[in-house]
Amino acid sequence: MLPEVALKIAAQKIGPARDFEGALVRDRFNVIAELKKASPSRGVIRGDYSPAALAPRLEAAGAAALSVLTEEDFFSGSLGDLKAVRQVSEIPVLRKDFIIDPWQVWEARAAGADSFLLITAIVDDGALGEMLRLGRSLQMEPLVEVHSGEELDRALAAGARIVGVNNRDLRNFDVRLETSLDLIEAIPEDCVAVSESGLSTHDDLVRLRSAGFDAFLIGEHLMKETDPSVPLREFLGPVCQRSK
């Protein structure tokens, strides 16, 4: 672990962040393609996990942004994975982890992250607001995740601009796309709305986009395939190549 002063210097010298928020509001199916080796609900998903090899294929297939799991115990991820992906990609990269301390926000930027996940359920209101403000000061607009109306109210009160609705209940891992549909009406139009987890077909994206969602986070459905670019192109339909 870097000393605090060294970490902050590294974060401030990393260069400008890529525009994560802007990448999610283009007039198309904006998919955040997630790179992960394992998950608490499925165990190891991809034994031959090489994020640096997978990221360019997902970008070429049309991903709007990439999400990289850096949590070690449950997802077998690392900050090294994020650094490797950032070096081989041109689109924004999000750090996905259980972020509960401002130190991790500095750490994310120093590793090259352009955004990071804030899970409303695991932080109090004070920490949520503090890390939102810190992220913005470092040019990173965070993805603030919610699963209920109460959590959405907290996220909006803290000033979240990118709201992710997790269709997976973290208490029992049950997945319901209706969670997104139930909450979309309460997400202001000037916020970026992201539907996360449980998306399995192009029709799911059509349905959710029609309801008002701007972007979609998809991981396991991609990672379980030998070539994840194939299902990503199927999700995107006619939009199968990233615009140069």
Predicted regions and their residues:
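An N-cap/entry alpha-helix motif that binds or orients negatively charged groups
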Residues: 1-48
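N-terminal active-site wall of soluble small-molecule enzyme domains
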Residues: 30, 35, 42-143, 149-154, ...
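Active-site-adjacent beta-strand anchor residues
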Residues: 75, 145, 194, 198, ...
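Short acidic, glycine/proline-enriched helix-loop-strand junctions
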Residues: 90-91, 139-140, 190-191, 235-237
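Catalytic cores of alpha/beta
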Residues: 100-111, 147-159, 195, 199-218, ...
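Catalytic-face loop-and-helix region of soluble metabolic enzyme cores
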Residues: 162-218
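C-terminal helical cap(s) of enzyme catalytic domains, especially alpha/beta-barrels
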Residues: 182-186, 209, 222-244
